[in-house]
Design a protein with these regions (language model features):
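A glycine/threonine-rich phosphate-anchoring loop and its flanking beta-alpha core
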Residues: 118, 123-181
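Glycine/serine-rich anion-binding loops at beta->alpha junctions
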Residues: 103-122
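Residue-level detector of flexible, active-site-proximal loop/helix-junction positions
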Residues: 77-79, 112, 135
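Alpha-helical elements of the RecA-like P-loop NTPase motor core of helicases
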Residues: 48-51, 115, 137
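Alpha-helix N-cap/helix-start capping motif
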Residues: 16, 43-44, 111, 133, ...
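ATP/NTP phosphate-donor binding region
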Residues: 1-103
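Glycine-rich nucleotide phosphate-binding loop and flanking beta-alpha elements
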Residues: 46-47, 112-114, 175
Length: 181
């Protein structure tokens, strides 16, 4: 389903099993990427899904005769971590990894992970593929078109508009999501 709430349109895929096909879905965007993928997630979702993602990322490019560079960064997913310090730390790590401007950032997690990663991806001028795992994050990523950060003065006061390259909402994740999210 296309979303047109921002100046650019982007696709939103909603179905079961998308995490297991994350590599394939991202590599299908291959019109401009350097086959570099940075996955930004939190420790809980890394433990739940990383092995499935790595298996898929290893399988598809090899079958297509492609090479792929894959990196993972773990960030904090609590609401207190949705700030400029987290974005700055993430940008420093992205620069240290030597990522090209053609890489794709995939963010796997709740709305905090998606907002911090989205803000950093926009600042770093790279493409973004949010993979939200909670219902609130799925709604925000699919319809929002901006990454929100908290300031000392209040919650969600800093916004960075963006149009992701693709949003992947794997409904299978909702069964692993805490009820309060």
């Amino acid at each position: 389903m296309p979303s047109t709430l921002t100046m650019e349109t982007y696709r939103v895929k909603i179905q079961r099993g998308l995490i297991e096909r994350l590599g394939l879905e991202i590599l299908r965007l291959n019109d401009n990427i350097d086959n570099e993928i940075l996955l930004i997630t939190d420790i809980e979702n890394s433990n739940l899904y990383l092995q499935k993602i790595i298996m898929n990322l290893q399988e598809y490019p090899r079958n297509a005769g492609m090479k792929l560079r894959f990196c993972e960064l773990i960030i904090n997913s609590c609401e207190d971590a949705k700030n400029f310090e987290a974005v700055s730390n993430l940008l420093e790590k992205m620069a240290e990894l030597g990522l090209s401007k053609k890489c794709i950032v995939a963010c796997l997690g709740n709305d905090v992970v998606c907002s911090v990663a989205g803000f950093a991806a926009r600042c770093f001028s790279v493409r973004l593929v949010p993979v939200p795992v909670t219902l609130s994050a799925m709604i925000e990523a699919s319809s929002g078109g901006s990454a929100l950060l908290n300031l000392n003065a209040g919650k969600n006061l800093a916004a960075m508009p963006y149009a992701p390259s693709l949003v992947l909402c794997d409904t299978e994740c909702l069964k692993d999501s805490p009820c309060y999210e």
